Amino acid sequence: MAKKALIVKAQRKPKFAVRAYTRCNRCGRPHSVYRKFGLCRLCLREMAHRGELPGVTKSSW
């Protein structure tokens, strides 16, 4: 889990637009965040397996 201070810091608008970065809305993780869902890869995988994300299915080929 991310520290509260880092989550609050990420929510503020930065002085320069290029300094903005995405964080997972669920756990606050800063890396590998899918913009479409606003979740990191770990939370996305967990929620997809539990069926909490509509329209997301496990692919097999």
Curated annotation (Swiss-Prot):
<dbReference type="InterPro" id="IPR023053">
    <property type="entry name" value="Ribosomal_uS14_bact"/>
</dbReference>
<dbReference type="GO" id="GO:0003735">
    <property type="term" value="F:structural constituent of ribosome"/>
</dbReference>
<dbReference type="Pfam" id="PF00253">
    <property type="entry name" value="Ribosomal_S14"/>
</dbReference>
<dbReference type="GO" id="GO:0008270">
    <property type="term" value="F:zinc ion binding"/>
</dbReference>
<feature type="binding site">
    <location>
        <position position="24"/>
    </location>
    <ligand>
        <name>Zn(2+)</name>
    </ligand>
</feature>
<keyword id="KW-0694">RNA-binding</keyword>
<keyword id="KW-0687">Ribonucleoprotein</keyword>
<keyword id="KW-0479">Metal-binding</keyword>
<dbReference type="GO" id="GO:0019843">
    <property type="term" value="F:rRNA binding"/>
</dbReference>
<dbReference type="GO" id="GO:0005737">
    <property type="term" value="C:cytoplasm"/>
</dbReference>
<dbReference type="InterPro" id="IPR043140">
    <property type="entry name" value="Ribosomal_uS14_sf"/>
</dbReference>
<comment type="subunit">
    <text>Part of the 30S ribosomal subunit. Contacts proteins S3 and S10.</text>
</comment>
<feature type="binding site">
    <location>
        <position position="43"/>
    </location>
    <ligand>
        <name>Zn(2+)</name>
    </ligand>
</feature>
<comment type="similarity">
    <text>Belongs to the universal ribosomal protein uS14 family. Zinc-binding uS14 subfamily.</text>
</comment>
<dbReference type="InterPro" id="IPR018271">
    <property type="entry name" value="Ribosomal_uS14_CS"/>
</dbReference>
<protein>
    <recommendedName>
        <fullName>Small ribosomal subunit protein uS14</fullName>
    </recommendedName>
</protein>
<feature type="binding site">
    <location>
        <position position="40"/>
    </location>
    <ligand>
        <name>Zn(2+)</name>
    </ligand>
</feature>
<keyword id="KW-0689">Ribosomal protein</keyword>
<dbReference type="InterPro" id="IPR001209">
    <property type="entry name" value="Ribosomal_uS14"/>
</dbReference>
<keyword id="KW-0699">rRNA-binding</keyword>
<dbReference type="GO" id="GO:0006412">
    <property type="term" value="P:translation"/>
</dbReference>
<keyword id="KW-0862">Zinc</keyword>
<comment type="function">
    <text>Binds 16S rRNA, required for the assembly of 30S particles and may also be responsible for determining the conformation of the 16S rRNA at the A site.</text>
</comment>
<dbReference type="GO" id="GO:0015935">
    <property type="term" value="C:small ribosomal subunit"/>
</dbReference>
<feature type="binding site">
    <location>
        <position position="27"/>
    </location>
    <ligand>
        <name>Zn(2+)</name>
    </ligand>
</feature>
